[in-house]
A protein has these predicted regions:
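Juxtamembrane intracellular "pre-TM" segments in multi-pass secondary transporters
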Residues: 26-38, 235-265
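Short amphipathic helix-loop junctions that connect adjacent transmembrane helices
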Residues: 61-77, 280-296
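Structural signature of the two symmetry-related core transmembrane helices
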Residues: 111-127, 327-342
């Protein structure tokens, strides 16, 4: 919102990368013992995080809205797109993340995936609305899902498979929390920009230019910031075999050794299933069932993100410190249910905001 068979494809194209060899530089720092988390790396990580979250928010919400508004109002099309891209992203994260662990190039093991991933991510975000040009409608739906699936593959490879692993590579226990926390802020900033401002942008320039702008931002930031990331060049041969490393993750012995962790993952999966049942349809619901304009829909969501997401983050953190994680997590489930119930039966803007605040404020708890 998190690397993939496109692994063979990446390996095939790594050799012809001479067209941007000058772009991805192998600096002396990469071979030295100097800290990798320099100021330029910090800035690059923040910008890559922001660009990724902007593009993800657009894909997660406005691809669906565009499909409904401009290709077909059949919600089945949106459901298929959400389901297929979720599977693609999951497979991509696992397979391409493992592949990046084993990659050895003069540019590092993570940067090629981040560079290529952000490039394709941005280009396909910009190209997505072209699906509406295809007729009949079934072909347009197919092209939209195809674009989104390819985009999701490269996006998950770049962000979840490679960038997340890169952050682990270049941080330590003493500074990892700050980096992750800063990237979390970038996520909320991106949410505020997209969910709060997208309606205004779309109203002013239309869907097509909206996608062109967001896609352009992701592409440019990927092209500029990825070469600024510093990475130690590894020459040792990767241990074990590729598919064996993936299989080891799902062995029964691994489940037994990490029992509590997998219980947590199962709980989180069930919780996120509930979230993703409704969240991809949020803007569609506000526009087509509550009958709010696209600007008013954006304002409702933007206010809730500003207050319930960004504003409530610190107080909830204090609450977690005082009560502990488990009580706050249980409270969040209860308030989520209440908030969604209020949201689903409300037709007035104040009640919609109240309901959304209840489920949004504790969604990160």
């Amino acid at each position: 919102m998190q690397a993939f068979i496109y692994g063979c494809f990446i390996y095939d194209i790594l050799n012809p990368l001479s067209c941007f060899e000058e772009c991805i530089l192998t600096t002396p720092d990469l071979q030295s013992n100097k800290p990798l988390l320099t100021r330029s790396v910090w800035v690059s990580l923040l910008l890559l995080g922001l660009a990724g979250q902007l593009a993800w928010a657009v894909e997660n919400q406005y691809f669906n809205t565009f499909m409904y508004d401009n290709i077909t109002p059949n919600p089945q099309a949106v459901s298929w797109m959400v389901a297929i891209t979720a599977v693609v992203s999951t497979v991509a994260t696992i397979t391409m993340g493992t592949l990046s662990d084993r990659t050895r190039t003069r540019w590092g093991k993570r940067r090629p995936y981040i560079f290529i991933g952000y490039l394709v991510w941005g280009l396909l975000t910009a190209a997505f609305p072209l699906a509406a040009k295809f007729q009949p409608i079934a072909v347009g739906v197919f092209i939209a899902i195809l674009f989104d699936s390819i985009l999701s593959f490269f996006a998950a490879s770049a962000s979840d498979g490679a960038l997340s692993a890169y952050i682990t590579d270049v941080t330590t226990e003493s500074n990892r929390g700050r980096v992750v926390g800063a990237l979390e802020i970038m996520k909320w900033v991106a949410f505020l920009v997209i969910y709060g401002g997208a309606g205004i942008i779309i109203q002013a320039v239309g869907y097509y230019w909206f996608f062109y702008i967001i896609g352009g931002i992701a592409t440019v930031i990927g092209l500029v910031c990825t070469p600024m990331l510093k990475e130690k060049i590894e020459t040792d041969k990767p241990e074990g075999r590729y598919w064996q490393k993936i299989a080891d993750t799902f062995q029964l012995s691994s489940l037994r050794q990490n029992k509590d962790f997998f219980k947590l993952m199962i709980s989180l999966t069930l919780f996120m299933v509930g979230i993703n049942v409704f969240f991809p349809y949020l803007m569609i619901y506000l526009q087509h069932y509550v009958k709010l304009s696209i600007i008013n829909s954006s304002l409702v969501v933007g206010i809730c993100i500003l207050v319930g997401g960004i504003g409530a983050a610190y107080p909830i953190g204090l609450l977690v410190d005082r009560w502990g994680r488990k009580p706050v997590a249980l409270l969040s489930v209860v308030l989520e249910a209440i908030g969604l119930t209020v949201f689903s039966i409300s037709q007035s803007v104040p009640m919609l905001i109240l309901g959304e605040l209840l489920w949004l404020a504790l969604i990160e708890a």
